[in-house]
Curated annotation (Swiss-Prot):
The modification Phosphoserine is found at S77, S92. It comes from the Eukaryota. It comes from Mus musculus (Mouse). This is Sorting nexin-33. GO terms for molecular function: identical protein binding; phosphatidylinositol binding. SMART domains: PX (SM00312), SH3 (SM00326).
Length: 574
């Protein structure tokens, strides 16, 4: 039942799923159950969407004091009754696609992947996974339920210091002895755990099993190359069934070059890996998986399209110096035994080095980098990525429109031209004494040739434009990751500047300010290494894309020319 509410503070939406509200604005709230600190409702302008639960109060009719106030509820709490990390039963609506309307998405849980995990894993492997692991890049549960959560499980729900040592943000703000925390708890800088890392609240681990090195290269910081490079092919998408044919799915054959045997994986296995990657690698642009669909998902064209895009996805994964070394990825590529698979799956889901803790795994160069120079480089890359994103979208739209013309308009026009030539040939046969069979046959053949050319145009996108669209789609996903990653670095810069100002004013020890600057260097080196890797891959991928497109275009028009030249020779000896 809809309830009336009142906005306690102003809130400005950052994406289409959220709506802006103003202080004292009257709201309609669809449900008083807060999930991950967000409510769904309607503002006074008739806009429907999400807004922070802590920014509103629910007004009960006739009882002015009896209302639910979320203003002290942290993001991730269920109203005033839940803790910071909800139990699995509370998280179930988000994972099942049911419950409140803003969580349901008919396109996210589709036939090929909506069955139980019993054929892959007989039980729930991480029952203590926090609800925060399901947060989206905007702080509320997105429709695809994918977010790199800052903390791995409920039992290490981010305890940076003992209770007596912990510096509460409000108390520390009053004392003015430490850098203030971001009051916007929905900021990805906060939710990712990077703020806590910068402020020194992420505890060092006694033993860190994995490390990733950054070194200085000719273009600045870069990831140290994988000492054991490899590739992986994806082949033979095969339709399989279970439950006596009631459910069906597509299985892909994966053959890594560094493993002895191929493995077979379904799309939902890829999806599991993808969410592990998002959960762990906070400052890395993880390539998006190709979309899944329910209607017609076993049609040949869709199967081929998904295969092409999974191949590109795998190519980017294996070429990334950090992602390719991830233990969960290696397990995904090589495990053949069911029992070992489940053990490795549980181990990946209980990984402690995720989110904020993942930043502890970096080994950075000793070279000094001026903070302003780094910020300038980040700003340049931000402008570049925005322009590239716009350009990729423009080229994608043009290429998609060209595909439609090839399949529809071009074929139709050439067929009309061919039919018109055929009509001329038939007309010439109407007066037998004056008809020329050789000429009529040549004109009729010309008509058939243009009909063939029309079919060639309809088939051509499979050889060039489809591959171009696949590459552009991959880069649209990669580019869409960078705004949040850059926001993390911007937040780190701000903390360094604030700490230095407080140190200059005598409100913070210089040693503490130096620690913040040192940890900011870690984030800065990681972002620059990721920017460097993106540029390297971009140059290779777009070179290959353009070469492939032009070669196929040349071959296509050569084939068209051969058809026309063959027809032309029929007129030589009339």
């Amino acid at each position: 039942m809809a309830l009336k509410g009142r906005a306690l503070y102003d809130f400005h939406s950052e994406n289409k799923e959220e709506i802006s509200i103003q202080q004292d604005e009257e709201l309609v709230i669809f449900s008083e159950t807060s999930l991950d600190g967000w409510l769904q409702g309607q503002n006074s302008r008739g806009e429907t969407g999400l807004f922070p639960a802590s920014y509103v109060e629910i007004v009960r009719p006739g009882i002015s004091t009896n209302h639910v106030d979320y203003s002290n509820s942290p993001a991730g709490s269920l109203g005033t009754q839940g803790s910071l990390y909800s139990s699995p039963s509370m998280a179930s609506p988000a994972r099942s696609g049911g419950g409140s309307g803003f969580l349901s998405n008919p396109g996210s849980f589709e036939d090929d992947d909506d069955d139980d995990w019993d054929d892959w894993d007989d039980g729930c492997t991480v029952v203590e996974e926090p609800l925060a692991g399901g947060l989206g890049t905007n702080g509320h549960p997105p429709l695809n339920l994918s977010y790199p959560g800052a903390y791995p499980n409920q039992h290490m729900a981010f305890r940076p210091k003992a209770p007596l040592e912990r510096q509460d943000s409000l108390a520390s703000a009053k004392r003015g002895s430490v850098v203030g925390r971001n009051l916007n708890r929905f900021s990805c800088f906060v939710r990712s755990g990077v703020e806590a890392f910068i402020l020194g609240d992420v505890p060092m681990m006694a033993k860190i099993a994995e490390t990733y090195s950054i070194e200085m290269g000719p273009r600045g910081p870069q990831w140290k190359a994988n000492p054991h490079p490899f590739a992986c092919s994806i082949e033979d998408p095969t339709k399989q069934t279970k439950f006596k044919g009631i459910k069906s799915y597509i299985s892909y054959k994966l053959t890594p070059t560094h493993a002895g045997s191929p493995v077979y994986r379904r799309y939902k296995h890829f999806d599991w890996l993808y969410n592990r990657l998002l959960h762990k690698f906070t400052v890395i642009s993880v390539p998006h998986l190709p979309e899944k669909q329910a209607t017609g998902r076993f049609e040949e064209d869709f199967i081929e399209k998904r295969k092409r895009r999974l191949i590109l996805w795998m190519d980017h994964m294996t070429s990334h110096p950090v992602l390719s070394q991830y233990e969960g990825f290696q397990h995904f590529l090589s495990c053949l035994d069911d029992k070992q698979w489940k053990m490795g799956k549980r181990r990946a889901e209980k990984d402690e080095m995720v989110g904020a803790s993942f930043l502890l795994t970096f080994q950075i160069p000793t070279e000094h980098q001026d903070l302003q120079d780094v910020e300038d480089r980040v700003d340049t890359f931000k402008a570049f990525s925005k322009k590239m994103d716009d350009s990729v979208l423009q080229l994608s739209n043009v290429a998609a429109e060209l595909v439609r013309k090839h399949v529809g308009g071009f074929r139709k026009e050439f067929q009309k031209l061919g039919s018109a030539f055929q009509a001329i040939s038939h007309a010439f046969q109407m007066d037998p004494p004056f008809r020329s069979d050789a000429l009529n046959n040549a004109i009729s053949h010309t008509g058939r040739t243009y009909e063939t050319v029309g079919e060639m145009f309809a088939e051509q996108p499979k050889h060039d434009l489809f591959q171009m669209l696949d590459t552009l789609s991959l880069y649209q996903g990669l580019l869409s990751n960078f705004p949040d990653i850059i926001h993390l670095q911007k937040g780190a810069f701000a903390k360094v500047k604030e700490s230095q100002r407080m140190s200059d004013e005598g409100r913070m020890a210089q040693e503490e300010a130096d620690g913040i600057r040192r940890r900011c260097r870690v984030v800065g080196f990681a972002l620059q290494a990721e920017m460097n890797h993106f540029h390297q891959r971009r140059e290779l991928d777009f070179k290959h894309m353009m070469q492939s497109y032009l070669r196929q275009q040349i071959l296509f028009y050569q084939r068209v020319g051969q058809q026309l030249e063959k027809t032309l020779h029929m007129y030589d000896h009339l």
